[in-house]
Regions:
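NAD(P)H dinucleotide-binding glycine-rich loop of Rossmann-like/cofactor-binding domains
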Residues: 109-114, 121, 149-234, 281
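Glycine-rich beta-strand-centered segment in the early N-terminal region that forms part
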Residues: 62-79, 93-156
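Hydrophobic/small residue at the entry helix of a nucleotide-binding pocket
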Residues: 211, 238-239, 324-325
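Adenosine-nucleotide cofactor-binding segment
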Residues: 248-324
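A short N-terminal beta-strand-loop micro-motif at the entrance of redox/enzyme domains
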Residues: 6-24, 39-77, 110, 115-118, ...
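N-terminal Rossmann-fold NAD(P) dinucleotide-binding loop
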Residues: 120, 240-241
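N-terminal Rossmann NAD(P)H-binding glycine-rich loop of SDR-like oxidoreductase domains
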Residues: 236, 244
Length: 327
């Protein structure tokens, strides 16, 4: 089988362009999908009762035509993000709406509007083919991919790609994601795989590390610097743990908000000292029907922060959980 030949070539250590450019491609490949005709399967259930094992499928899918600015990658490892979980339980909306809208953009985006959605927003792997306009990447190169898919035809995105009106999260708002044997990405999503990391290690940071970097470090983000005090929500999770480590590496002081003693220990193990267990403190920032905030609870949180920092407010808030923690 062609997939077996691709796997064997990668495991052999041969990375010559000629070898990979001439490897036969399979007619189909295995991919993790959700199906458009099942978007109502969890209707009426609470979020915690929706089981992704019922909605996720392993399907044989065809390889679509490659666009001029894309690369076809043999996936060696991928990772799970919350957007994959959201996709699998069709919350807060079905991702097929994203695919339908993207499909109206141009000839090549039309490929994404399918009755199935291949999920996954991280990968490490080896380039197999490149589109006609790709010059940096060649077959045989080991790569990782970040999740931001952009068109960059609009000037709004030239200084900051997050401002591109056509920016999307690959594998969430686009099709052909990374939880598959093969994946299609835009060439500008690719980066060289770090030689000192395993396939699994290099596949896991793409989405969360780049997001945390954009928020905290980049010139378009908070421009974190020595001495800053940073309030980090969800500090033990994927995004939060990178934010915590970045703050420590920059000589800043992270104030880590977590939800359990176990998660607090994860932060301590990373080197953080100032930690707030929000469940132990009993914070309730919104009323029972989530229509109004409670200012006194935010004031109580502020008092706790100042107790930990010696009377200082924070310089940066690293917020990513969503509405409940928007003060």
């Amino acid at each position: 089988m062609a997939i077996d030949q691709i796997r064997d070539a990668i495991l052999s250590g041969d990375r010559s362009e000629e070898t990979y450019a001439n490897l036969p491609l399979p007619d189909t490949y295995r991919a993790t999908t959700v199906h458009k005709d099942e978007v109502e399967m969890f209707k009426g259930l609470k979020s915690r009762d929706k089981d992704p094992r019922k909605s996720l499928h392993i399907d044989d899918v065809p390889i679509p035509e490659l666009a001029p600015d894309e690369a076809l990658v043999a996936v060696m490892a991928s990772a799970i993000n919350f957007n994959t979980v959201w996709t699998s339980i069709f919350e807060p909306v079905s991702t097929f709406g994203f695919l339908e809208r993207y499909g109206r953009l141009n000839k090549y985006s039309k490929r994404h509007d399918l009755p199935y959605h291949i999920v996954g927003s991280d990968l490490s792997g080896v380039v197999l083919r490149t589109g006609g306009h790709v010059s940096k990447w060649k077959p045989g190169q080991e790569v990782v991919a970040h999740c931001l898919s952009v068109e960059l035809e609009d000037a709004d995105g030239h200084d900051d790609t997050m401002m591109d009106p056509q920016q999307r999260i690959w594998g969430f708002e686009t099709n052909f994601g990374g939880l598959a044997e093969l994946a299609i990405v835009k060439a500008n999503q690719l980066m060289p795989k770090p030689e000192h990391l395993t396939w699994e290690e290099s596949a896991s940071p793409g989405l969360v590390n780049s997001t945390a970097y954009r928020q905290l470090i980049s010139k378009n983000g908070a421009a974190l610097k020595l001495g800053d005090r940073v309030l980090i929500w969800g500090a033990s999770g994927g995004l939060g743990s990178y934010a915590t480590q970045m703050a420590l590496a920059a000589g800043a002081t992270p104030i880590c908000v977590v939800s359990s003693p176990e998660k607090a220990q994860i932060c301590r193990d990373m080197g953080a000292e100032l930690i707030i267990d929000r469940n132990a403190e009993g914070y309730k920032f919104w009323n029972d029907d989530n229509t109004e905030q409670n200012p006194k609870e935010w004031q109580r949180l502020g008092k706790k922060i100042r107790e930990l920092t010696g009377g200082h407010d924070v310089d940066i808030v690293f917020e990513h959980p969503g509405r409940e923690t928007f003060g």
